[in-house]
Swiss-Prot record:
Major localization listed first in the record, in broad terms: secreted
Name used for this protein in its record: Omega-conotoxin-like SO-4
Signal sequence residues: 1-22
Top-level taxon of the source organism: Eukaryota
Provenance organism: Conus striatus (Striated cone)
Length: 78
């Protein structure tokens, strides 16, 4: 019984600490614009059509990688 009560108190205490910490850190992100620009540049960094896209290449194709020729291809336009 004592152990159960201690576990319940510990869980409540840890939950309260998490909630207090979350409230204190709201809106305090530094260099917000720098971080978002970096994410965008990483997301758009891709291999153009006609270039090799095999397993040794670290970037992804802007379109899709042909499974047979391992060449980046553009998506067909309808």
């Amino acid at each position: 019984m004592k152990l159960t009560c201690m576990v319940i108190v510990a869980v409540l205490l840890l939950t309260a600490c998490q909630l207090i910490t979350a409230d204190d850190s709201r809106g305090t992100q530094k260099h917000r614009s720098l971080r978002s620009t970096t994410k965008v540049s990483k997301a758009t960094d891709c291999i153009e059509a006609g270039n090799y896209c095999g397993p040794t290449v670290m970037k992804i194709c802007c379109g899709f990688c042909s499974p047979y020729s391992k060449i980046c291809m553009n998506y067909p336009k309808n």
